[in-house]
């Protein structure tokens, strides 16, 4: 049996494969008429799709609107949001974007289909509060870099290849480290806290290892991985993500783990000092740990919806 990520991901991939129209590259820098290349490039390079926006991971529409606002404040035009708050007509324009941003693991298959179909590059990361600047910078770099690589193509071959990838599970879920924004700068801390609370210098920034993390968070790899990155950068604390979901390959940072089953999770949490997780995890957490509630609708449903997402 698969979890929700698998089913929702395949559903969005099917939409990307069949409802985004024929593959037609337009507005390319290399094809623009003389004098209009810069205008065409600038206009296209700021267009973006958000992939994997579902209430199961992000919560109500207001949470998605907040994410979109953060990106718009950095000058991005959100063409479509897959799939909260937008129509099928809006999703059908996805091929016009310069870059796609996967905001949860659900969006990875659609991102790969759109890449195969239109050549659109994608990055993985959630613009949680305090992280939107880094997200925008990463998007800017890849949008600028890919602009000159696009070539006009007005036949059906790209559309067909988009359909072909739908039948290849490994290709649908493929993610490379370079595409994951919250991997970047992970080892940038020059000093960390040891269990005594004192700061110590690390001998090699590429060998950051913590036997006991300062903070343990539980949840979906992209949203919580992005949150972990913000906490580490802002507070200099080591954060470990424990993910109870099925699809994590290529999405977990060094030191993060996939945990299957309640017993395994309870065992892993025995040494946790600060825990951020859905409230339903509290009964299996040690009483000595500080527990911060962060509801995950895919786990606890609507039990805490009104308490934490009043609208």
Where are the regions that the model predicts?
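An N-terminal assembly and electron-transfer interface module characteristic of large anaerobic redox
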Residues: 1-311
């Amino acid at each position: 049996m698969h979890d929700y990520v698998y089913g929702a991901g395949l559903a969005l991939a099917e939409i990307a494969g069949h409802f985004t129209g024929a593959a037609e590259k337009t507005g390319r820098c290399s094809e623009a008429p003389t004098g209009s290349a810069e205008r065409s490039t600038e206009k296209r390079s700021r267009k973006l799709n958000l992939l994997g926006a579902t209430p199961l991971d992000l919560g109500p529409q207001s949470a998605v609107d907040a994410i979109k606002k953060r990106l718009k404040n950095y000058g991005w035009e959100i063409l479509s949001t897959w799939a909260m708050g937008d129509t099928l007509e809006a999703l059908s324009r996805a091929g016009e974007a310069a870059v796609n941003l996967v905001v949860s693991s659900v969006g990875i298959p659609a991102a790969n289909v759109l890449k195969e179909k239109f050549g659109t590059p994608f990055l993985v990361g959630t613009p949680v509060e305090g992280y939107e600047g880094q997200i925008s910078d990463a998007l800017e770099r890849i949008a600028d870099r890919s602009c000159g690589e696009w070539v006009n193509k007005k036949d059906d071959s790209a559309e067909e290849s988009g359909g072909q990838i739908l039948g290849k599970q490994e290709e649908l879920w493929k993610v490379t480290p370079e595409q994951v924004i919250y991997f970047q700068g992970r080892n940038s801390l020059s000093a960390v806290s040891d269990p005594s609370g004192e700061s110590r210098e690390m001998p090699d920034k590429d060998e950051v290892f913590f036997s006991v993390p300062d903070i343990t968070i539980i949840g979906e790899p992209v949203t919580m991985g992005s949150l972990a990155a913000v906490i580490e950068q802002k507070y200099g604390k080591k954060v470990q993500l424990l993910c109870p979901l099925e699809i994590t390959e290529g999405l977990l940072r060094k030191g993060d783990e996939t945990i299957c089953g309640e017993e395994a999770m309870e065992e892993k949490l025995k040494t946790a000092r600060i825990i951020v997780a859905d409230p339903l995890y509290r009964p299996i957490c040690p009483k000595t740990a500080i527990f911060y509630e962060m509801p995950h609708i895919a786990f606890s449903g609507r039990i805490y919806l009104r308490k934490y997402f009043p609208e």
